[in-house]
Amino acid sequence: MSASPKGFRFATVSAGFRKEARPDLALIVSDTPATAAGVFTTNRFQAAPVVVARENLSARPVARAVVINSGQANACTGDEGMTNCRTTLDLVGKACGIPAAEVLPASTGVIGAQLHMDKWREAAPRLAAALGQNTHHDFARAIMTTDAFPKVAERELAIAGTTVRLVGMAKGAGMICPNMATMLSVVLCDAAVTPEAWQRLFLDAVDRTFNRVTVDGDTSTNDTVFGLANGASGVTVEGEDLAKLGEALTDVLARLAYMLVQDGEGATKVMRVKVSGAVDDAEAEAVARTVGHSQLVKTAMYGRDANWGRIVAAVGRSGASFKAEDVVVTLCGVELFRNGQPTDLDFDTLLREPLKGRDVTVDIELGAGTGHYELLASDLTHDYVNCNADYRS
């Protein structure tokens, strides 16, 4: 386990936002102003904290704190929700001695539920007093909703002979189909980076990781990824070292993205859909997403069924351009389909053991060009239905 990046403190408390008594309010404070980046949901119904966080970052890409509550999403809550969100930043800022404009909010929970402001007023001073008593692992645990486990990824790298640390924390198990679903993540770094470079690195890393996962095809109103870089290591990243930092950032987000799919509500499989030979990358993405979203493919994977017909049918309705006879479908290294028909391999026997594992790879070659795309998707189980049927109760 790596140490946390320098210059960040963590706090979690139980504010009573959830039915069960457990930490449900989490705070990160940087000892010094940090360069801040953000990537947000593309859902047209954007939660109040998304709107407010965008405003704060647009005004000035600097932050001292991130505060996240679990229990109420504060989405579709009208003017009252916006006012409440800004009030929470005032409360946290006052308790911590930080300008409210330098506090970034995020919320997760039931859509349409107003924040419990009386509980916020009582909890904010306790939260500030607890700073330094918790770890980034505690933070990840406090922001969970239907998650089965906290999601943390750490990375160290050497720049200019000095160790730079990154840590990422995320939550999400359902409503995951980001296009930066609910998916929240915070990444901390103790290097100094210019706002322009940090945001650019963030956008690229999110596009290559979080935007390439799906659990159920639903995109949340609250999707948020924050990144804070405070320079506490004494290292300024610039020039050629930016690519090195970008690779480390992408690695952290990629591991978090895998955990999000691994922890998809009720999931037993992580399906890696790899499409190649498309006319272009956009068509490869269309194929990967159609296969990854297919309920028939997902349930086949859950049932350990080498049902190539469901995969081929999904490929065929993706809208991509190709000749049917050029398509090759391979599952866990076993070729199932070629020349417009199934192969003569005994793939049910060959795949009996591989399909018992958690990781499943679906390779689809279209033979139409050089476009390629890769997507992570979960399977679909009885537990997913049970979890979401009972979510509000």
From Swiss-Prot:
Q: Which GO terms describe its biological process?
A: L-arginine biosynthetic process; ornithine biosynthetic process
Species this protein is from: Nitratidesulfovibrio vulgaris (strain ATCC 29579 / DSM 644 / CCUG 34227 / NCIMB 8303 / VKM B-1760 / Hildenborough) (Desulfovibrio vulgaris)
Instruction: Kindly state which reaction or reactions the protein catalyses.
Output: N(2)-acetyl-L-ornithine + L-glutamate = N-acetyl-L-glutamate + L-ornithine; L-glutamate + acetyl-CoA = N-acetyl-L-glutamate + CoA + H(+)
GO terms under cellular component? cytoplasm
Major subcellular site: cytoplasm
Where is the site Cleavage? A181, T182
User: Its Enzyme Commission number?
Assistant: 2.3.1.35, 2.3.1.1
Q: Which gene encodes it?
A: argJ
Protein name, per record: Arginine biosynthesis bifunctional protein ArgJ
* Pfam families with a match to the protein in the record: ArgJ
Protein residues bound to substrate:
T145, K171, T182, E265, N388, S393
Query: What does the record give as the function of this protein?
Result: Catalyzes two activities which are involved in the cyclic version of arginine biosynthesis: the synthesis of N-acetylglutamate from glutamate and acetyl-CoA as the acetyl donor, and of ornithine by transacetylation between N(2)-acetylornithine and glutamate.
Arranged from A to Z, the UniProt key words for this protein are:
Acyltransferase, Amino-acid biosynthesis, Arginine biosynthesis, Autocatalytic cleavage, Cytoplasm, Multifunctional enzyme, Transferase
Any keyword Acyltransferase? yes
Signal peptide (from-to): none
